[in-house]
Regions:
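Phosphate-coordinating catalytic segments in nucleotide- and nucleic-acid-processing enzymes
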Residues: 47-273, 341-376
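Switch/communication elements of ASCE P-loop NTPase nucleotide-binding domains
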Residues: 1-55, 249-375
Length: 376
């Protein structure tokens, strides 16, 4: 994604990020909107997936209130539509870089009758009865380069409030939901959001896929940078993740008995390797990590992002995370990554819009020395 713009979403009245790099770090004081930016990026990248609402709800512990979409709107003001847009760059063709924009407008719709059951695009339980008093739904209008008219569909809670359903408005909308974007956003139309809480269930699935494809060696190399005893990763049929720490241990050690740093590091690198060609969004990148592990983390991220062609957009509250990134880039062996990195300072203005200030590698050290705005 080359740029991202959002209006009236979560804590963001307005924000724009431009010239996004392969690896991006968002910094700023508390309540500057960093997590909301990640959620907005997640929405636009997963707009045809009916579960994006549940996914971002879970990051805020809002899943108990399953019939209220108002928390998605800035200031809970549903009279103004949410606007999200992402600009994507394609492969260079004849010295030109094709650019296209995917835009989405979300508004609240008060409905009292369901659309015909045959129009339901996705639902977990097809025999769920009609609900004569359906809750509010979200009307989503998409503008994409491959069609000349907007595409529209509704997101609505199911009868039992357990999952989301998508209702296409017409055949073009149905085709888009089934096939996805055909233009250059397609390769990046996949995003994974990592919150501050480790999800060992998802991690188990990712590790299983990597082991099947014999791609776990890079994970082990990164983990051994923190603990040289780690020999291999094992998965149990029950979903437990184990680490083999060598002959000094009689049994395999469950991952959840290791420190938070090992879990966090494994979750991040595994997410990158499992989402090749997509976007990985990481909230509080350094959460659970001792500052001494930050160099290991950055080296692993920079290498994996290039290896798997993944765009990284992460947040931090720590100036240490930014300092260690600059120190890693200062090393001559990592000079090739310098053009792949950007940091953005987010500052909430008096009118409550959030302004972003971009720093490339050459500007990072100066920005740190002159008090780039982070919590500490």
């Amino acid at each position: 994604m080359e740029s991202f713009e959002v209006d009236n979403f979560r804590s963001l009245k307005h924000l724009k990020l431009e010239k996004l790099a392969r690896v991006n770090l968002l910094v700023g004081k508390n309540n500057s909107g960093k997590t909301s930016v990640l959620e907005g990026l997640f929405v636009i990248a997963n707009i045809r997936n009916p579960y994006w609402v549940q996914n971002i709800e879970s990051t805020r512990n809002l899943s108990a209130d399953r019939s209220d979409f108002r928390h998605l709107f800035y200031g809970f003001d549903t009279s103004k539509s949410i606007a999200l847009s992402g600009t994507y760059c394609g492969e260079i063709i004849e010295a030109q870089v094709p650019i296209a924009t995917l835009s989405a407008a979300l508004s609240l719709v008060d409905r009292h009758t369901l659309l015909p059951r045959e129009l339901v695009y996705y639902e977990r339980q097809p025999n769920t009865p009609k609900n004569p008093h359906a809750p509010d739904s979200l009307l989503v209008i998409l503008q994409t380069p491959e069609v000349d008219i907007p595409i529209g569909f509704e997101l609505r809670r199911s009868f039992k409030q357990e999952y989301m359903e998508l209702y296409p408005r017409d055949n073009k909308s149905r085709a888009y939901l089934e096939q996805g974007p055909a233009f250059i956003a397609g390769p990046r139309n996949l995003a994974k959001l990592l919150t501050t809480r480790s999800n060992l269930y998802w991690l188990n699935d990712e590790l299983e896929g990597l082991k099947v494809n014999k791609e776990e060696n890079q994970l082990l190399e990164v983990l051994r940078s923190l603990d040289k005893r780690i020999q291999r990763i094992e998965l149990s049929p029950s979903g437990q993740i184990y680490l083999d720490l060598g002959q000094d241990f009689r049994t395999l050690l469950p991952l959840n008995l290791m420190g938070e740093g090992i879990q966090r590091l494994l979750s991040i690198i595994s997410a990158i390797a499992s989402n090749a060609g997509g976007i990985v969004l990481i909230d509080e990148l350094d959460n659970g990590l001792h500052y001494s592990a930050l160099r290991v983390l950055w080296k692993g991220i920079l290498h994996a992002a290039l290896e798997y062609n993944v765009q990284i957009i992460a947040t931090t509250h720590s100036a240490e995370a930014l300092r260690h990134l600059t120190w890693v880039l200062d090393e001559e062996e990592n000079a090739g990554y310098r053009d792949d990195v950007a940091a953005y300072t987010l500052i909430r203005a008096e009118d409550d819009t959030v302004r972003s200030y971009r720093h490339d590698y050459e500007q990072l050290e100066y920005a740190i020395e002159h008090g780039i705005e982070v919590r500490n």
